[in-house]
Amino acid sequence: MKLSLSPPPYADAPVVVLISGLGGSGSYWLPQLAVLEQEYQVVCYDQRGTGNNPDTLAEDYSIAQMAAELHQALVAAGIERYAVVGHALGALVGMQLALDYPASVTVLVSVNGWLRINAHTRRCFQVREQLLHSGGAQAWVEAQPLFLYPADWMAARAPRLEAEDALALAHFQGKNNLLRRLNALKRADFSRHADRIRCPVQIICASDDLLVPTACSSELHAALPDSQKMVMRYGGHACNVTDPETFNALLLNGLASLLHHREAACKELL
């Protein structure tokens, strides 16, 4: 699997791996790259079955497989310890990495994530699936911004959204791959295993997220042994895109604090 690695800003700089949501594209994190690359070596990638990592996914494709193939690609690139920043589905992959490779994951940041899919989120995806089956890729792509962005943000950026729609349609991951990735997301359930995640976790959510209620982040916060929760008042599901200034400040402060916390804890053990 192809990865995109930025040059380390200094020797032995911490590594931060960015995992996008259902869309799977590493370019989702473009508003974060410049600020993160000043402090960290940053890894982005298109998830298997999307973008520059094309493949035909199996019907039983799972979050555990997503985590395993990413970890293997990181190890092949010489990266054995890393922090993870995951959005929605990417946050699920991050939790799976923290469970399966605890010696590798130093810190986890969950952005609009959850323990198991909420009834409201499931309903949203059911509507989107019906659009996909009845109207094809174009209907899926055109509806997607409604679940990602606040209405006023969209209204002020109509030409941008039209361009994004055209790009998303041109690089659509395919109906079968999309549904298999979506089914993996819907099957994932960390409610019985979250207490085994020992790395420090920063939880970021947006109070106006149409797709994932903030209660999901509250449940996640309550279930994790070592977590902190930050709520953005504005931004929608894709709050890192719509309000990058607020999001980036939270992310940078959180990473610095949690990595220091992890380093101090490791020294105490020594």
UniProtKB/Swiss-Prot annotation:
- SUPFAM superfamilies listed in its UniProt record: alpha/beta-Hydrolases
Recorded GO terms, molecular function? hydrolase activity, acting on carbon-nitrogen (but not peptide) bonds, in linear amides
The keyword Hydrolase appears for this protein: yes
Record's Gene Ontology CC terms? membrane
A biological process term (GO) from this entry: nitrogen utilization
Keywords assigned by UniProt?
A: Hydrolase
Which Gene3D superfamilies does this one have?
alpha/beta hydrolase (3.40.50.1820)
Assigned EC number: 3.5.1.-
According to UniProt, the reaction catalysed is: carbamate + 2 H(+) = NH4(+) + CO2
Annotated HAMAP family? RutD
Role of this protein? Involved in pyrimidine catabolism. May facilitate the hydrolysis of carbamate, a reaction that can also occur spontaneously.
Protein name per the record? Putative carbamate hydrolase RutD
Q: Which organism is it from?
A: Escherichia coli (strain SMS-3-5 / SECEC)
Q: What is the lineage of its organism?
A: Bacteria, Pseudomonadati, Pseudomonadota, Gammaproteobacteria, Enterobacterales
Identify the coding gene: rutD
